Amino acid sequence: MREIKEEYDCLHIEISEYIQSPEKTLVEMDAKQEFAFDLYFKRLPVFSNKIREVLKKISIDAYTKIYQRAGDNIRASGQVNSSKFDESKVFLFPSTINKIIKSAHHMARKNSGSCFIVIDAIRNPYEAIFFKERYAGFYLVSINTENENRLAHLRSAHKFSESQIKELDEKEYPSKLAGYSKFVSQNIQKCIEISDIHIHNPREEQFNNIELKCQLAWYVSLIQHPGLVMPTSLESCMQIAYTVKQSSGCISRQVGAAVTDAEFSVKSVGWNNTPQGQVPCLLRNAEDLLRGQDSHAYSEYERNDSKFREVLHGKYDKLRKSPLLEGRNLSFCFKDMQNEIDGEKNQVHTRSLHAEENAFLQISKHGGMKLSGGILFTTASPCELCSKKAYQLGISKIVFIDPYPGIATRHTLLVGSNSPELQLYRGAVGRAYHQLYQPIMPYKDELETLLSIPGNANKKALRTKALEKENLELRDELERLKSQLESLKNEG
């Protein structure tokens, strides 16, 4: 580390002076922007590569581990060497990146050039939301591949061992985050869930990435020029599933599903929610249950079981009057409470139907129709139970976004003679679907304006010209007839 210590100290002094330097005049502001551009786009990338190489000499995964720990600490405290939580520092990373973006825009304007920014890479969902709230043209892009391809890449390209891969997965795909860890830790699964555009990188051939390039070209073109092409059938159907998930009353996560026939004609939609007639968890209140109010919203078990009410009282009695609620509903998760009572993790206790299950049941509820050969779209991926239902119904393809951390794929679906095809979703969803595929002006109007194609405004002139031509022809015909008539008179 000695080989980079001197350079680090010099950079640290320069950055400290840069932060403290005044920016009261346009000249001072311009100087700071130019310094920031030179620092972040030219000098720091070179220094960062030096750090990477030094850390790799320590161990294969030293760079990843140290940078992940440093990132968590900076989000928590604003300092690399402290994990003490300070809520004012949560958005330090995106705030700094935002300043870097402004310096790039400044230099682009100064040089009369264009400016397109790519941030590689965002692994904290709240940092993504920071940019979504500030830039209408921000798109969170997830590049996904099958898990087998991902593992093979980590083993071959990064030389990771199985234990190192497991440790990396536990860090980037945490099973459960509590407290302030939700704000400072990496959570790639949540980032995938809120992504605007999903790109599929098959990684089937080491030196052939044409499929990846084609997808990137498609969406970069649409970002720069919305409405150039129509959405694919996959995108249209997944957008429906993505839209209906907002109807979910689950307080843990929202999932949507759509079932179509083989021609992408939608037959049913569903979302994770309680059965019809039961109140969703989002609308239930622990205070109401403790006070015995709104009894139809709670089960006989919740109202009368002494052990359950003891746990409920211990968790929520002091919280129901908390000023921090500020009008929020004090909802609670029955599954979590029951699992705490039983001392185990059991998904059976969930009150909600799964989105895929709900979509299947909606079809039978309203008369039924053939689903064999159909396609299931889900904004998550089906669990073991929903996978068995899809298999039994003869679903031929399952299109999913978020890989489920279970054995549904390998155990439940990839078995027997009628296994459905599993396809990672590629396409735009949510806000991006509308922004990318809705043209700013009708394409015909755009071409007419761009190429000066004569439009409807010349119709009157064209009609006048046609009438004038017709009038001349009629005059000629009249003169001919007059001449013939004169000849006949002379002969008589």
Spell out what each predicted region is.
Residues L11, I15, K24-A104, Y180-F183, ...:
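Zinc-dependent deaminase catalytic domain
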Residues S95-I101, C115-I119, E127:
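N-terminal helicase ATP-binding lobe
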Residues F138-L140, I197-I199, I398:
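Short, well-ordered beta-strand core segments
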Residues M1-E3:
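Glycine-rich phosphate-binding P-loop
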Residues A121-P125, S381-E384:
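Short beta->alpha connector loops
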Residues D120-I122, F131-H158:
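Conserved phosphate-donor/acceptor-positioning beta-strand/loop module used by diverse small-molecule
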Residues S103, E127, S156-C214:
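Small-molecule kinase domains that catalyze NTP-dependent phosphoryl transfer to phosphate-bearing small molecules
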Residues S114, Y135, Y139-L140, M369-I375:
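Short beta-strand/loop segments at the ligand-binding rim of alpha/beta enzyme cores
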